[in-house]
């Protein structure tokens, strides 16, 4: 089998077009663009090559990447990930195409926490990605559609406010049991994303792992869906097992936690590999916030 050819930079004319697109993007969104030091270096290498195309081995990356944060209103924003390609995507396919025509940018629209998944999927499917001005057209399209979506949500919320307060607005405390939750970054997401859903509680890693959430049923469901689909997207489905062990609801339920926090470091470790929280300390932690009676319900002890 013949060895695959190394990726080749785009033709000079196409690279100039991509450079202009990058400059336009930076000039139009100076405060909304996030770029890393490596992105700035990549742009500098591109400009150096365009100033002196005679370089035998240009130090061009495969692409230049940006994160674009678009404000819809003071409380809502969108995030787009944009890649401007600098190499030929497929040399063989490109032989019959216009060699000077640059590849279209790759635009990824990340689902914001305030938008439901179905709406996000519908918007992604209708993004004008095939246009030569796809970035600007996508920005305008998403701003317009998101503004309309938020207005619809606000109107629906006002109409259904009494019913929502009677059902979804009730505070509940839900206890989840996890076989294991050893990855620190995943636990950080559990803690850091909770305020977006007005949730309080705690997470305890190890075997067993315990997750306690205080908030409305709707917010807890949306939060758990977000954690599973985004934070845990790289985890095999059979390892995402999490079960609701106990739910406290009723007029008497009040928050006992002031925020969302991780308590793993506060519990001594036991077990053969030191990955199981000492149950005596866990029980005392429950009792310390007035929840000693639910200890057996949660852990089945």
Curated annotation (Swiss-Prot):
<comment type="function">
    <text>Part of the gene cluster that mediates the biosynthesis of the antihypercholesterolemic agents phomoidrides which are dimeric anhydrides. The function of phiF within the pathway has still to be determined. The pathway begins with the highly reducing polyketide synthase phiA that catalyzes the formation of a C12-fatty acyl-ACP, starting from one acetate and 5 malonate units. The hydrolase phiM is involved in the release of the C12-fatty acyl chain from phiA.</text>
</comment>
<dbReference type="Pfam" id="PF06544">
    <property type="entry name" value="Prp3_C"/>
</dbReference>
<dbReference type="InterPro" id="IPR017359">
    <property type="entry name" value="Phi-like"/>
</dbReference>
<dbReference type="InterPro" id="IPR010541">
    <property type="entry name" value="Prp3_C"/>
</dbReference>
<dbReference type="InterPro" id="IPR016135">
    <property type="entry name" value="UBQ-conjugating_enzyme/RWD"/>
</dbReference>
<protein>
    <recommendedName>
        <fullName>Phomoidride biosynthesis cluster protein F</fullName>
    </recommendedName>
</protein>
